[in-house]
Amino acid sequence: MKSPPSLSRIQKIGMSSGLDSVGIANAEIFKSTLQDLTKRKSKGLHAGMSFTYRNPERSTNPKLAMPECKSLIVGAKSYWEPSLEKSKTGSPTGRVALYARQDHYGALRVGLESIAEELVDAGYDARILIDDNALVDREAAYRAGIGWYGKNSNILIPKRGSWFVLGSVLTNAGYQPNKPLKDGCGSC
């Protein structure tokens, strides 16, 4: 088995494949997230959000998805786009959430697949987790130093905001994790 690709190589591959940010987190259990999800679920504070609260033990422990996992390579893909022009015909128009206008997870997957391929080519295992409740993406992104938790509970990426979809490559390649970013929020 070769040495794992360098962090700078991983970031370069991700960014050249369309990702907007790439960071590394360790594969430890997200203990505080597990406690928060379990507490909210037991108090009925999940408002029927079964996707998020279905299996907190699984979604906060990367090693349940990949037992030999040592590192998470977390990617973010922006879905921000400028406002569309308003209809000039006077016809009714609708509003659709930005993230629902196209398959942004598909673009995220392309970037993460390019990273996974590089790892596999070097002899390492890689598993991609995107939008399937197998991992709490926001906590992975926070731990990977991609952004911080904003007052809206979303991950805020410096100078970019919260208009991102998130996903991870789990791997048995060991990397030094990035440090989480300090809270950059003001008093909005």
Where are these regions (language model features)?
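Auxiliary alpha/beta "docking" domains used to position bulky ligands
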Residues: M1-S187
